[in-house]
């Protein structure tokens, strides 16, 4: 069944087709079938929040955050597959590729397609694309996308005036040909990243704010990102090394900053030989339509940096950057820089390309990145470069390359201020390491090992991964020690009483939820683990909900910060989960009691609630409602 039929229904599809045939020019029905590579990208931006209270007011409003995160959009693009040049050893677009470089879905539609077909960045597909001639009303489409996303996740996507990218081609069908392998989950061997940072220069557009700032030099960016005496404490190397316990390396030998990289403001890519097509010139001057097909008899793709920020412009940036880097190698291949750069360019496993764009570029977002990285290269873009938050923004986008989703709290997409994937606005120059679910997701951390096991061992952490099977004889497990997250990598307790066991394929009750309990300490050492954590979460046990697993092909799960204590929302040292109805011995609730906290650990008791609200079984010798009282000791039984 085609994607169009799935989305709109057979009757609607036939009606739309009939209307198109009646009214559209001949080229509106042009279809392209070929082999392409899929990329899912995530964007966010900063905005100024509204005043704390509207004017006029006699006293100034209270101090507030100067900027807040805004969700921008998720975008699904089809690009040419990457291959390796047999002469140079560099990655390149497959010269046999005949698919356009195009956005095919945005917003909720992009997520739906990705999740339904389990698409990972770098997957190679056989696709049939139909050119889109008339874009939908962008404000209506954006509203529908926001509504669908809110319904799917339960989170509020803060309103934004930015339009969703308009798909340039409609995805009619797809079939997976080659799936990329998972590469971003730690499996016992440190991941040594190769990274090139490109400082981009769009001064050819002759517009203010489109040149690379004179103060933004390769030397400055290198100093900002690598460990050194003059580096900010949240430099990228320190971020990766500290938060991953050195499981991910940002080695100076595999890192370079290049630029400024000049890019022609307007240009095009010569098409390969193919049957003639009706002409489709670039839009007229002043046109607001940014995303009609860029393919015609003159160009296989064209771009205009002064007006647009589509897949075509992004590919123009990347082509110019790669050509710039390769030219440096060609000029002096035997120099230390030439050899180092050539080695990075020829690396075939998840090379990171970070693009620092001029602040005036025609993009609505502040940061934009590939979500997951399995192809030879993956990209992260930042618009502008601020000494205040540049490293936080870049780390956020870099962790999208790792496959991490946003860290939320309740209905707020970026509401978790304990994770760089959430609200990092108050982290300043400190490190804000990922929360427990995200640390587990990429293999940087795991549940606690059995007492007595030394830190940083290969033990799996299965001892602290609790299911219904752990509570069969006694509902209480007392005296569990949760180490501070920065002290060792087995540092969380995971509880899912709706699961029979942790075994693959084990029975689970409908609605089963895993809860992650972790302990965070604000590090007062500059550049130390969690040195960017706010005092709100210092010496706190955090409770997150997360049902994801360690797989890059399991989509749709985001961590959700529920509460933190000892002083939980219950105004006590106790947190209680919602109750899940019993089914085949699975389900119930979870109660967490914080007994003590220190500078290095928290001690907690955990109980499985089998009777909701009050004790009903008064002669079984079990504290079924987890109030600490059994049978006749419980007032419920008196």
Swiss-Prot record:
Motif (Cysteine switch): 95-102
EC number of the protein: 3.4.24.38
Active site: residue positions: 397
Signal peptide residues on this chain, from the entry's feature table: 1-28
Residues binding Zn(2+), per UniProt: 97, 396, 400, 406
Glycosylation sites: 30, 126, 296, 458, 465, 470, 523
Region (Disordered) residue spans: 269-292
UniProt keywords, alphabetically: Cell wall, Cell wall biogenesis/degradation, Glycoprotein, Hydrolase, Metal-binding, Metalloprotease, Periplasm, Protease, Secreted, Signal, Zinc, Zymogen
Cofactor note: Binds 1 zinc ion per subunit.
Catalytic activity, reaction form: Cleavage of the proline- and hydroxyproline-rich proteins of the Chlamydomonas cell wall. Also cleaves azocasein, gelatin and Leu-Trp-Met-|-Arg-Phe-Ala
Pfam families, A to Z: Peptidase_M11
Transmembrane domains' residue ranges: none
Family to which this protein belongs: Belongs to the peptidase M11 family.
Domains: entry comment: The conserved cysteine present in the cysteine-switch motif binds the catalytic zinc ion, thus inhibiting the enzyme. The dissociation of the cysteine from the zinc ion upon the activation-peptide release activates the enzyme.
Purpose of the protein: Mediates digestion of the cell walls of the 2 mating type gametes during mating as a necessary prelude to cell fusion. This enzyme acts specifically on the framework proteins (inner wall) of the cell wall, cleaving several model peptides at specific sites.
Protein name: Autolysin
């Amino acid at each position: 069944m085609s994607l169009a039929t799935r989305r709109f229904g057979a009757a609607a599809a036939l009606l739309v087709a009939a209307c198109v045939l009646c009214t559209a020019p001949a080229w509106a029905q042009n279809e392209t079938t070929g082999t392409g590579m899929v990329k899912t990208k995530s964007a966010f931006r900063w905005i100024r929040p509204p005043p704390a209270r509207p004017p006029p007011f006699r006293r100034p409003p209270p101090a507030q955050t100067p900027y807040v995160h805004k969700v921008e959009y998720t975008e699904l693009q089809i690009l040419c597959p990457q291959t390796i040049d047999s002469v140079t050893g560099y990655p390149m677009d497959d010269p046999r590729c005949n698919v356009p470089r195009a956005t095919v879905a945005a917003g909720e539609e992009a997520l739906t397609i990705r999740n339904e077909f389990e698409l990972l960045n770098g997957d190679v597909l056989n696709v049939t694309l139909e050119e889109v001639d008339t874009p939908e009303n962008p404000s209506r489409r954006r509203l529908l996308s926001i509504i669908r996303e809110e319904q799917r996740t339960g989170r509020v996507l803060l309103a934004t005036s930015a339009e969703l990218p308009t798909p340039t081609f409609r995805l009619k069908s797809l079939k997976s040909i080659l799936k990329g392998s998972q590469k971003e989950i730690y499996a016992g061997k440190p991941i040594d990243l190769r990274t090139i940072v490109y400082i981009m220069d769009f001064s050819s557009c002759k517009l203010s704010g489109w040149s690379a700032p004179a103060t933004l030099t390769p030397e400055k960016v290198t100093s900002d990102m690598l460990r050194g005496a003059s580096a900010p404490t949240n430099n990228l190397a320190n971020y990766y090394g500290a938060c991953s316990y050195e499981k991910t390396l940002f080695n100076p030998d595999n890192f370079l900053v290049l630029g400024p990289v000049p890019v022609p403001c307007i240009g095009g890519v010569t098409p390969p030989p193919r049957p003639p097509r009706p002409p489709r010139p670039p839009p007229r001057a002043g046109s607001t339509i940014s995303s009609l097909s860029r393919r015609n008899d003159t160009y296989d793709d064209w771009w205009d940096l002064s007006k647009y920020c589509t897949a075509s412009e992004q590919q123009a940036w990347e082509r110019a950057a790669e050509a710039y880097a390769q030219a440096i190698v060609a000029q002096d291949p035997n120099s230390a820089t030439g050899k180092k750069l050539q080695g990075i360019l020829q690396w075939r496993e998840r090379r990171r390309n970070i693009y620092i764009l001029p602040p005036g570029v025609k993009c609505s977002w502040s940061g934009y990145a590939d979500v997951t990285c399995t192809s030879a290269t993956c990209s992260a873009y930042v618009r502008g470069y601020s000494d205040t938050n540049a490293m936080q923004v870049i780390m956020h986008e870099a962790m999208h390359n790792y496959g991490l989703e946003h860290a939320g709290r309740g209905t707020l997409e970026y509401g978790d201020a304990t994770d760089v994937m959430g609200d990092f606005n108050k982290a300043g120059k400190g490190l804000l390491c990922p929360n427990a679910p995200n640390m587990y997701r990429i293999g940087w951390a795991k549940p606690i090992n059995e007492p007595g096991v030394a830190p940083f061992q290969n033990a799996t952490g299965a001892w602290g991964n609790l299911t219904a099977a752990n509570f069969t004889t006694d509902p209480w497990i007392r005296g569990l020690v949760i180490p501070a997250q920065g002290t060792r990598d087995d540092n969380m307790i995971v509880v899912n009483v709706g699961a029979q066991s942790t075994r693959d394929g084990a029975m689970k009750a409908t609605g089963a939820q895993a809860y992650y309990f972790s302990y965070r300490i604000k590090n007062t050492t500059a550049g130390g683990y969690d040195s960017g954590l706010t005092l709100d979460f210092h010496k706190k046990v955090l409770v997150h909900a997360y049902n994801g697993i360690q797989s890059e092909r399991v989509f749709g799960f985001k961590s959700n910060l529920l509460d933190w204590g000892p002083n939980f929302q219950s105004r006590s040292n106790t947190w209680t989960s919602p109750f899940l109805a019993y089914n085949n011995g699975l389900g119930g609730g979870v109660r967490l009691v914080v007994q003590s906290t220190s500078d290095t650990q928290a001690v907690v008791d955990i109980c499985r609630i089998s009777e909701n609200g009050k004790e009903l079984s008064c002669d079984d010798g079990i504290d079924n409602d987890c109030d600490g009282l059994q049978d006749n000791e419980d007032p419920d039984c008196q």
